[in-house]
Amino acid sequence: MSTTAAESWSTLQSASSSTAVGSALNNEQSLRATGKGSPFVQSNLRLFNSSEKPKITLYRDHAGWCPYCQKTMLLIEEKEIPINIELVAMRSYGDKPAEFLNMVPSGLLPALIVEQPDGRKRVITESQVIMELLDRWHPTSEGYKAMLPSEEDTVGWSKFDTLANLERELFSWWCTLVFRPEGPRLGGGSGGLMGMLTGKGGGEKEMSGSMKGFLDCLSKVESALTSTPGPWFFGEYDYPTMIDFIYVSHVERMLASAAYWKGLDLRSAEYKAQFPGLNAWLDAFEKRECYLAFKSDYYTHVMDIPPQYGPGFDGGFEDKRKEFSQCINGRDGKSWKLPLPHDDPVQPLYRGPPLPLCALSAAGIESDADGTYESTNPEQMAKACRHMAGWKLSSNGDKVARFAARGGVDGAKNPRKSFGAPLADPYANPDQSVVPSVDAVLRIVCAALLEDGE
């Protein structure tokens, strides 16, 4: 194909900047570079209202796929702690820099580096330790939000410890459910143990012991959430605190993996009725821009979970599992086909802001009274989404083309070592013969995204 018919990337960048959404995103990008502006997963500096250079540096993963880095960043953003940020590859996605390994030989993320008065550097690992120290070093007396009970609040600390232990119990049940083969279903019906013994095939009402254990543990979490007047674990605050962040990064991954591998949609009408507190808690998170900046979609999670935790095992409610996995993989004939549907049946997009607030404002899109965007004009929202996608692609299109061209016939795999996520191999070379064509196709796509028409 002709590689000259499509407009150049520089022309496309100019076209993107001329749109209302692109102009707003350019301005926001400039603010972020100074440490201010809205939350962003790849920010290297957060100053908020401070003008001083931070003396602490957080090392975390690039994409926000590490749940422990994610919960740490959520506390930093909610509490507005000035901090330097360095992005380091997770073990599954590439080598860690020698400079980082010299400071943190284990390679663990996140890691906090604190500059001491004598010039030495103190290294702190483990997300919960980092979060507790950050809260202690930035007290309410200096205008920061409280993230933990006060020292004299013994009742609050007892509640925090109980909830933290429950989170570990929930995590354990999730691992048992998703990353191990399921045993026979419990119950006397045709799908249960008796059905297996008698050879009769079965319905979906019975469930395995691991599924029951997971749902029973979720019921304990539900009780804790519904015991407070607001959506959060500690009802005396009108914002999420550290225990909410400890939970949400893994609950987010539970939602995706349970739907994909087990056919369990915890956000469906059925489970909203069973777990109203959990769903109200998730709804509240999904209206907060700092959470959405680090939140991933279901497809991303079911791809990034196996390199970190191991493969998921199919099971659970089989008919629903097939339905959800095909939807998430784009193989249901609808979810990845043009014209794209306005919303996603498994992971609705408009419970909170689907784009950065600056982009929505530039597009003239306002939230509903409840903070959702469910009544927004679909065509207006689609145009804003296209323009943001065009803005992102135009700013990095040549690199996207080279990355995509690694899938060509002569694309080189890394002969020296392998990583847990082979598609993210940083050493794999593109098939140079197809780079110009791939680049041209992407420029045509970008131009289409930036058009004003439908």
Predicted regions and their residues:
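GST-like domain detector, emphasizing the conserved glutathione-binding G-site
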Residues: 2-233, 312-454
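Acidic catalytic cores of enzymes that act on phosphate-bearing nucleotides/polynucleotides
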Residues: 293-295, 326
